[in-house]
């Protein structure tokens, strides 16, 4: 399941192997502040686009909801039902019951902090899929999965309840994301989708009685590294997890494309070709995942670790960064070539690039050749109109970035 916070990310997910996408509209979702989100008017088009691609659509309505938002809440659910959205991801019982009253399938958000079989049984009154708490280890996940099978716990649609877990992306230092730090310091509630991420800053610990500053190994003491499970994804699957969820609705389309493609390849190696997760494949996928936004990686709590691992810097530890240089003008499908205008910087054969657009998604490729008019050249510079081979269609206005090593 891929995170979608923009049109670019949506099409990046669709072209990279995602089986489902999740996203928010208007407010009432946990990334209302940090991602672009969509409007109610977008729902029908998103649902139709994904349906045509054979991809399911999951709408997040997973914040705390107040009485004053009942009308908006109802409008969102009505629009979701009318558009044919596959399911609602929710945590507030008001959203859960209202969605079921409209005939919408419900998935229980990780905000509900489900850690045991009885909680799964309780939510199975409304939900066909539950996201377990991120603080569980794989033995605990396996015990819950076994209990669902053994006790035949079924959701409203008649099938056994499915377990969904996060497999990659940002983690919060609070239990299942229930954090009040942003509200306390900035009057902006994380539980309302408005986290200001002040936990990601560097902090100095001071003894208030003496004024002494304490020497700590890492100043980013509230900023966890990102979760990565690709090197033990076979164990996650064996634990009974049926839906893998990637975090990252606030991240760019190149992140979505890269992470979805990596986990798709890993799953196919585990399930389809019998080769499994070889050390060579894991190393290759690790290299790819390191290129896009991350705060460093750790295993989360899945392998039994009790304490978190913290970031060592502010912002991303990615090995690549995007630098905008050009805008697409047209595409020549028979030639497999895109034409661009260089607006900043320069480009040379062998450079790695990312091309993004609301319909294009994210294309990651290496420049094989550059032409000015019909003549091959060794570089394109500011003001040049140039053409390069592209792996798929590009559209006027698409943005071309140099994806350069950090």
Predicted feature descriptions by range:
Residues 115-120:
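Short, glycine/polar-rich helix-capping loops at beta-to-alpha or helix-loop-helix junctions
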Residues 96-101:
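Short active-site loop/helix that positions an aromatic residue
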Residues 9, 94-95:
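Alpha-helix capping/helix-boundary segments
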Residues 1-4, 87-91:
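Short, hydrophobic beta-strand segments that form beta-sheet elements in well-ordered domains
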Residues 1-16, 20-32, 46-47, 53-61, ...:
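Surface-exposed amphipathic alpha-helical tracts and adjacent flexible/coil segments at the periphery
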Residues 35-44, 49:
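A phosphate-binding glycine/aspartate-rich beta-alpha loop in the early core of alpha/beta enzymes
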Residues 124:
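Positively charged, amphipathic and often flexible ligand-engagement surfaces
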């Amino acid at each position: 399941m891929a995170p979608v916070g923009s049109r670019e990310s949506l099409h990046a997910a669709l072209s990279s192997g995602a089986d489902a996408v999740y996203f928010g509209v208007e407010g009432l979702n946990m990334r209302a502040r940090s991602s672009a989100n969509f409007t109610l008017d977008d729902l029908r088009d998103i649902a139709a686009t994904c349906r045509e691609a054979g991809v399911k659509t999951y709408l997040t309505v997973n914040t705390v909801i107040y009485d004053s938002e009942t009308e908006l809440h109802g409008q969102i659910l009505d629009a979701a039902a009318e558009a044919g959205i596959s399911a609602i991801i929710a945590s507030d019982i008001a959203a859960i019951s209202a969605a079921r009253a409209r005939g919408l399938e419900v998935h229980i958000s990780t905000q509900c902090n489900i850690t045991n079989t009885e909680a799964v049984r309780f939510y199975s009154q409304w939900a066909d899929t539950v996201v377990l708490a991120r603080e569980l280890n794989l033995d605990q996940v396996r015990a819950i999965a076994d209990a669902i099978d053994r006790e035949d716990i079924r959701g409203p649609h008649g099938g056994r309840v499915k377990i969904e877990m996060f497999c990659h992306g940002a983690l919060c230092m609070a239990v299942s994301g229930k954090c009040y730090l942003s509200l306390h310091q900035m009057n902006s509630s994380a539980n309302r989708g408005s986290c200001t991420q002040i936990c990601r800053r560097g902090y100095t610990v001071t003894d208030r009685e003496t004024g002494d500053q304490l020497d700590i190994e890492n100043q980013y003491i509230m900023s966890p590294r990102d979760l990565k499970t690709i090197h033990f994804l076979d164990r996650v699957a064996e634990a009974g997890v049926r839906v893998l969820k990637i975090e990252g609705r606030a991240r760019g389309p190149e992140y979505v494309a890269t992470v979805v493609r990596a986990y798709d390849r890993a799953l196919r190696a585990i399930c389809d070709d019998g080769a499994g997760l070889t050390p060579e494949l894991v190393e290759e996928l690790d290299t790819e995942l390191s290129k896009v936004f991350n705060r460093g990686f750790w295993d989360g709590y899945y392998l039994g670790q009790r304490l978190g691992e913290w970031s060592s810097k502010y912002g991303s530890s990615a090995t690549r960064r995007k630098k905008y240089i050009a805008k697409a003008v047209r595409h020549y499908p028979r030639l497999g070539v895109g034409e661009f205008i260089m607006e900043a910087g320069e480009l040379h054969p062998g450079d790695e690039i990312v091309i993004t657009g609301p319909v294009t998604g994210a294309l990651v490729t290496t420049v094989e050749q550059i032409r000015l008019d019909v003549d091959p050249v060794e570089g394109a510079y500011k003001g040049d109109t140039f053409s390069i081979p592209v792996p798929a269609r590009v559209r006027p206005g698409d943005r071309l970035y140099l994806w350069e090593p950090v």
